[in-house]
Amino acid sequence: MDNKPLITVAEASEYKELLALEKLPQSSQLSYKAIFKSVSSEWEQVKTDITHVNENILKDINEEIEQTDQIEKKLKSSFKSINQHYHKLLKHRRNRQNDEGTSDLFLKYKNDVNELASNIETIENGLDMVIQNMISFDSTSSLDGDSLFNSSIITKRHYPLLYDLIHKNYNKGQNSDKTSKDNSKITTDVTLPASDEDNSPDIEEQQSKLSSLSFSIEKAQNPIPVDKAKNTDNSSRSIINSNVKIKNPTLILPMIKQRAQPSVALDAKPVIARDSYKADTKSIIAPEIT
């Protein structure tokens, strides 16, 4: 059997590897304080890096917040503008719908106006026919000088509206102005002679007619209410008859008939003015009775 040489521990390779290892630290060096103290520089660097990272992160977060605020403001402004445009659109839509309804309403009004114009034309034609019939009837059925369309003061006071309507819309005769001026006064201030001949039937009849004429003029100047007309009619006649003194009535009545002749051409073509239907009765001045 081969004999191998004896190898000592010091010469062994394992021992050499063991010697190559670092020595174990002492127990005092294994405490927390010693450990942190040994790595204090690295620890400070880590703390600095963490702080720097934290600051950068906070900075980025703040920037993001600012950008978010700006975006939110822009969104609010855009939303407000969109809302305004939306309300304007609704308003225009309502106006458009109202315009369509207004157009229909205008068409309806147009038809109503056309119908009203047709009715007015019919009324005007009827009014022309009525006035023509009145003129024709008056010219054929009126008494001596008692025509509705002459310038007699009796007719003018009894029928002021009709008188003004006819004389404003129909041509007058050539002598109408002169006749109107002559008819402005009627002389009744005459005295009856105190004789027995005045009691004849003809003179009494003429005196009664002239008294009735004076009563009609006085009644037109001072209208009496309907409820008091019956009670005051007889008393007014008695007062007027007692106040009128006639010197010669046979001269008065022919003069009245002569001045009461019609002064309007009855065959004149009517020209009706729409704004002159209403007569101003205040402008009709009563004639002076001298």
Curated annotation (Swiss-Prot):
Where do the coiled-coil regions begin and end? 54-130
Which GO cellular component terms are attached?
Answer: cytoplasmic vesicle; vacuole
Q: Where in the cell is it found?
A: Cytoplasmic vesicle; Vacuole; Cytoplasm
Main location class: cytoplasm
Q: List compositional bias (Acidic residues) regions by residue number.
A: 195-205
Q: What exactly does this protein do? A: Component of the biogenesis of lysosome-related organelles complex-1 (BLOC-1) involved in endosomal cargo sorting.
Per the record, the similarity remark reads: Belongs to the VAB2 family.
Q: How does it assemble?
A: Component of the biogenesis of lysosome-related organelles complex-1 (BLOC-1) composed of at least BLI1, BLS1, CNL1, KXD1, SNN1 and VAB2.
Q: What is this protein called?
A: Biogenesis of lysosome-related organelles complex 1 subunit VAB2
